[in-house]
């Protein structure tokens, strides 16, 4: 096994170390088997995306995801607490504060090349995780594409320009993803959040609860696993360019769940909640997250709808004052019909 590392980091800073692997899994976009928004079985129109047939994959797909382990043996998965159940297929939350350092011990358990490329934090060319003709060579290229079975250590720092700005709340969200054929990699599932706080450690002391939501139309036609999914879940597909087949593999999800199947969105009245929003995708990924029954503060402005473009990142705050179960969804009409809907529940104190 090849183990490589990028340049050394300061001994004076607090270093946050994460053991993260890229793993292949089977993912169910609707594990309850029904539309939780309506409380009924999927309709004919909804079954376009979730029903299995001789020539349709359905709601379960082979994907690649980032998963956190307890140490560099990568033998034991680190348990994900109930407060992060809602992350779905997103990778683990990477946290740090301004002035801290981040160390990612990354193992590629896939059969294809992968990397870890961060947004927002400071990295040198030997820790960028992105292959392109940038004029570098030698050690500066080792981070770009990690071979199957190999391990690489990425080291990033968090200067002031990576943390919250003057109009931001006390913590903000960035993201990380594989940049080896980035569209195919992110459609396959290789993406996760980075949370940076003004305070060292990456935790914000002025909030009670945090949620991360990715809004994206995952194009399962453009992943590493289309042929493998066809082989495993269908009896064969004659024409993968067929419009109906193509449409059936466009999964309009939030954290990899459709039609209200996103779990774990539970909080208590009176709590201060911070929402970290991530947009990703292509030209159809123009999203408008909307919360029912509550409002949020974004850069000092109050609203209940935001706009998300592909690769955009937004952090908003909500003070809970309205008990009940509330819709949280993209307000684009086509995305509503295709299942980009979830719910959050506000319990009594």
Q: What does each of the following model-derived ranges do?
A:
Residues 3-5:
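C-terminal motif of bacterial Sec signal peptides marking the signal peptidase cleavage site
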Residues 7-349:
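Copper-binding active sites and cupredoxin-like electron-transfer domains
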